[in-house]
Swiss-Prot record:
It comes from Pisum sativum (Garden pea). InterPro entries: Asp/Orn_carbamoyltranf_P-bd, Asp/Orn_carbamoylTrfase, Asp/Orn_carbamoylTrfase_sf, Asp_carbamoyltransf, Asp_carbamoyltransf_Asp/Orn-bd. It is found in: Plastid, Chloroplast. Feedback inhibited by UMP. Catalyzes the condensation of carbamoyl phosphate and aspartate to form carbamoyl aspartate and inorganic phosphate, the committed step in the de novo pyrimidine nucleotide biosynthesis pathway. It catalyses: carbamoyl phosphate + L-aspartate = N-carbamoyl-L-aspartate + phosphate + H(+). The keyword Chloroplast applies. This is Aspartate carbamoyltransferase 2, chloroplastic. Its EC number is 2.1.3.2. PANTHER family: ASPARTATE CARBAMOYLTRANSFERASE, ORNITHINE CARBAMOYLTRANSFERASE, MITOCHONDRIAL.
């Protein structure tokens, strides 16, 4: 028996319903006796076309009436989009990390390397990127999928003619199965996810968030330090404009007995909303201007660049902030032997090149871990667990 619609291609073999498009209006919960929907805080604010819900709801009712279970337990990924770090809980994080470890073991030309064959990912980048764009494209291709890419959508797409983000998303979703979006405006990914009928992955939205970077950062810490509970992390550099440190802070707050140090020039201090969030979650945090002392206490020194592009015409403030906190041999000498230095990259002069040779310099390994995290995300969003 086979059921189909404009949204789904449903096969009753093995009692599994395989969505052609994996984005659903509500999270799916499967059990042995019934299938039900649950709303999440993130999804409650999202509006979906009634026709999509009607189709899905009727499929659900049909399958329940026939006594057939459409999803094997745990097959459907809990999230429809990856927009912000607050979407993840510890169970989801642990499960994603398990999938990422599996991704590390995939061999070329193996059956596992073709699990996304027939799927097409669009990378829509309105801001420059090297690692994020290339790692997502590499992740897709390493799993057998294909890629549509635009490197500078702000200049070389219809956005230059005045097309809205919403119209662009509605158009591009007709060509692809998933969109990886980087945009210069905070909240752009949420806007895209609200109107898209396919998964949206936030690859950075202005000074807002960068959730896939935070996932790979936490994965890196686990791989390098061996634990996440009880760690001390020093966040250094541009904490006001750095979307990576915002997303990372949200994820670190999910672990026990974590302490976070904020080390930054006055003009780019961590914003109050993040500090208030940590306080509300009972996370210990401290602001400091002594990088040597913080480095001596921390398991992770997470350095970031001062983001010149966020200063506009106030280049005097940029020059005032730049170069104030540098990771060099003096910082290495203060650090513990097990500790690591991380950086989301690109690096300017905030980590001296001679640090690269020290085994505690983890930033290039961090970039490699990002490939496996993004392979895991693509696999989960498109085909499930």
């Amino acid at each position: 028996m086979t059921a189909s619609s404009s949204l789904f291609s449903c096969s009753m073999h093995m009692e599994v319903l395989t969505p052609k498009i994996s984005k659903w209006p509500k999270n799916f919960v499967s059990c042995h006796s019934k299938i039900s929907y649950v709303e999440t805080n993130y999804l409650k604010s999202t509006c979906y076309p009634i026709s999509r819900f009607f189709c899905i709801n009727n499929l659900k009712k049909t399958r329940q009436r026939d006594g057939i279970h459409c999803f094997s337990e745990g097959q459907k990924f809990q999230l429809d989009d990856v927009v912000e770090a607050q979407q993840f809980d510890r169970d989801i994080l642990n499960a994603i990390f398990e999938v990422a470890r599996d991704m590390e073991k995939i061999e070329r030309n193996s059956p596992e390397s073709q699990i996304l064959k027939g799927y097409l990912m669009a990378t829509l980048f309105y801001e420059p990127s090297t690692r994020t764009r290339l790692s997502f494209e590499s992740a897709m291709r390493r799993l057998g999928g294909e890629v549509l890419t635009t490197e500078n959508a702000r200049e070389f797409s219809s956005a230059a003619k005045g097309e809205t983000l919403e119209d662009t998303i509605r158009t591009v979703e007709g060509y692809s199965d998933l969109i990886v979006l980087r945009h210069f405006e905070s909240g752009a990914a949420r806007r895209a996810a609200t109107i898209a009928g396919i998964p949206i992955v936030n690859a950075g939205d202005g000074p807002g968030q960068h959730p896939s970077q935070a996932l790979l950062d936490v994965y890196t810490i686990e791989r390098e330090i061996g634990k996440l509970d009880g760690i001390k992390v020093g966040l250094v550099g541009d904490l006001a404009n750095g979307r990576t440190v915002r997303s990372l802070t949200y994820l670190l707050a999910k672990y026990k007995d974590v302490k976070i140090y904020f080390v930054s020039p006055e003009v780019v201090k961590m914003k109050d909303d993040i500090k208030d969030y940590l306080t509300s979650k009972g996370v210990d945090w401290e602001e400091s201007s002594d990088l040597v002392e913080v480095a001596s206490e921390c398991d992770v020194v997470y350095q970031t660049r001062i983001q010149k592009e966020r200063f506009g015409e106030r280049l005097d403030l940029y020059e005032k902030a730049r170069g104030k906190f540098i990771v060099n041999q003096n910082i290495l000498n203060a650090m513990q032997r097990h500790a690591v230095i991380m950086h989301p990259l690109p690096r300017l002069d905030e980590i001296t090149v001679d640090v690269d040779a020290d085994p505690r310099a983890a930033y290039f390994r961090q970039a490699k871990y990002g490939l496996y995290i993004r392979m895991a995300l693509l696999k989960l969003l498109l085909v499930g667990w």
